[in-house]
Amino acid sequence: MPTRSPSVVISDDEPGYDLDLFCIPNHYAEDLEKVFIPHGLIMDRTERLARDVMKEMGGHHIVALCVLKGGYKFFADLLDYIKALNRNSDRSIPMTVDFIRLKSYCNDQSTGDIKVIGGDDLSTLTGKNVLIVEDIIDTGKTMQTLLSLVKQYSPKMVKVASLLVKRTSRSVGYRPDFVGFEIPDKFVVGYALDYNEYFRDLNHVCVISETGKAKYKA
């Protein structure tokens, strides 16, 4: 039986990197505490995840389902690596994409009230290998809701790839099949992860400062 792939574990006392060591947009200079995961490390890890995905799912038509909005950069980069592997494989397979949007956050807390936006026509998932691509797993409740929805369409296989998984006491115990980084319970932004729609334009994953939280609070 396939096992979940290992992840890069970032410890609770990880100091991160000084903002001055990286190119950070000036409009966010006072809003961030530190760079937590540099963009280059994200890309290297994503390349390896693509290999793991193809090894486990590459025998049948894959439908890659992007969870918007936070997942779009990870989704695009992961698919670029998967497509490169697929092009150079002797047993290449067709791959299609679809999109769904979930809403469960206000400010820095998951509300528990999960809204599914889109996904009205997911009948194309029937009989396919479905790869759900998410930016971050916090409590796991949001993903459990989405998995319940997807499984109603009888896919051949469903796997989840998430760039980040938080270690938090609020977790329901859900763990994705493919994980980039396991991180402490900090609110992170950047690489399309947002705080009330801000910070998506950062290349790196960063820890937001209290100043930033207050400035962009809903």
UniProtKB/Swiss-Prot annotation:
Keyword Signal on entry: no
Segment forming the signal sequence: none
Residue numbers of Phosphothreonine PTMs: 142
Sequence position, cross-link Glycyl lysine isopeptide (Lys-Gly) (interchain with G-Cter in SUMO2): 115
Domain of life: Eukaryota
Pathway in which this enzyme or protein is active: Purine metabolism; IMP biosynthesis via salvage pathway; IMP from hypoxanthine: step 1/1
MF term (GO), any: magnesium ion binding
One cellular component term from this protein's GO annotations in UniProt: cytosol
Major localization class: cytoplasm
Residue(s) of cross-link: Glycyl lysine isopeptide (Lys-Gly) (interchain with G-Cter in SUMO1): 115
Names of required cofactors: Mg(2+)
Subcellular location: Cytoplasm
CDD domains xref list: PRTases_typeI (cd06223)
Residues annotated to bind Mg(2+): 194
Active site: 138
UniProt catalytic activity: IMP + diphosphate = hypoxanthine + 5-phospho-alpha-D-ribose 1-diphosphate; GMP + diphosphate = guanine + 5-phospho-alpha-D-ribose 1-diphosphate
Residues bound to GMP: 69, 134-142, 166, 186-188, 194
Protein family according to the UniProt entry: Belongs to the purine/pyrimidine phosphoribosyltransferase family.
NCBIfam families: HGPRTase
Assembly mode: Homotetramer.
Name of the protein in its database record: Hypoxanthine-guanine phosphoribosyltransferase
Source organism of the structure: Mus musculus
UniProt lineage: Eukaryota, Metazoa, Chordata, Craniata, Vertebrata
